[in-house]
Amino acid sequence: ATMLCFITTDAGVSRDVLELCVQSGVKSSFNCITIDGDMSTNDTVLVMANGASGVKLETPEDIYAFQQALAHVMLELAKHIVQDGERVTKFVTVHVTGGRTEDEAKKAAEAVAKSSLVKSSWNGNDPNWGRIIHAVGYCGAKVDEEKIDIDIAGLAACRGGVQADTPSDDLRQA
């Protein structure tokens, strides 16, 4: 499906600053979601600022506060888009920490989030952490499997690349 997102503000912000804020916000929100792995050529995020409030964003502190608020709005809207997706029954957030670089961590997160096998296990309430580790393995990032820990809903599924002591039934119910 095509995603159309329109955000308006009455703050007075220059076009250049607004563009930077939008790019930063999109990078950490809309560009991090996936439902079916497809992207429409018409997906759009449009932010308009008319300055009608008379509040001008000129200081670095004001611009930073605006950027943070805009990023928060974008993240919440991105979450809603996922939750409203066609045939969506689960909402899962993938967090990768300890990657060698931010790009490698993002590659690993995207591989897990887009994996049909991982999605199938989530949909079937099957805590198959092996599918997660498999997706991380093929993502192209350099990985030390002995350092991989996987939690499912806050419960340890894998520690140091091997199965943790958490009972499978507990993971299924998580």
Segments and roles (model prediction):
Residues A1-A174:
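A structural signal for small-residue-enriched, beta-sheet-centric alpha/beta enzyme cores
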